[in-house]
Amino acid sequence: MTETSDLPAFGAPDATGTQHRLHRGSAEAVVVGLAGALRRYRVAGVDLTEPYGPDVVPPAANGIQMSPWPNRVAGARWILDGVEQRLDVTEPARGHASHGLLRNTHFVTETFSAHAVTLRGEIHPQHGWPFRLTHRVTYELEADGGLTVTAEVQNHTDATVPVAVGAHPFLRIGDVPTAELSLRVPADAWIRTGEDLIPVETLPVDGTELDFRRGRAVGEAALDVCLTGLTPDADGRHRQTLLAADGRAVTLWTDHAFAYTHVFVTDRLPGRDTALAVEPLTAPADALNSGEGLHRLAPHARWSVQWGLTPHVPDHPHEEDRA
């Protein structure tokens, strides 16, 4: 593939496409063309997301953008205006369509600077999806070392389109094993699923091992659960924090559109016994069928949502401290 010649780039394109390296103070991020994914984010030399190489497809969907739906569509089928739509099956083991239509899409670079990059991915009409959309994502490093991610969906059709979005970051604190970290998610409820991982009912977290409201150790739990009923802070944002015993932490924040957080622990990331994904979602699994959390995007309209990461790394200098 050919990289945009008038834009700086980092590394070879390889499997993940164009590499964009952002830096600000002691913070750095690498954003790639494939799936508009966040390949690495670290502050003061401490990795706060699970990194992977430029020459591999994102393992376990690490860091990808998910649109026009996150998680699964049951049986890869949904109903639009009384007509069954049949999506391509992308999770053969269960027969579902998983994580939207951008996982294998190479995003085009729209703007690129030292601090920020905006990428554009196109969703064309295809099996089970009759709409044309544009999905833009902007990653921007802030002066305090935080990372802000803005996703925008644009409707190019004359129809109202049901959409939902999400992201799939795996969080970490340097080399601390995942089992030794603590996670806080201010969620009052969890979504019970069947063996096919499709939602069955929403239940309170009270008295369960899924109550992360005051924080609890990740431990050896086999987590794969969607949490909801999120309590916002005074500024209206939802915040989930991963914390190490030495005080280092990373907080994932979202705006009000992200009413769901999917917590997923896997042993499928190379070099890690286990890894923890904390996925911000605007809708849960199978939203195209249930309607839960779906945004109805008006003809030719745009919809923008935002989330980000805040580092808590002792002795991390802010950009203004360097002035």
Predicted features by range, described:
Residues 1-25:
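Short, Gly/Pro- and small/polar-rich lid/capping loops
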Residues 2-8, 170-255:
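Active-site/ligand-binding surface loops and adjacent short beta/alpha elements
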Residues 27, 96-110, 218-290:
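Acidic/His-leaning functional-site neighborhoods
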Residues 28-84, 89-91:
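Acidic-aromatic substrate-binding/catalytic surfaces of carbohydrate-active enzymes
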Residues 123-174:
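Acidic, contiguous internal or C-terminal segments within carbohydrate-active enzymes
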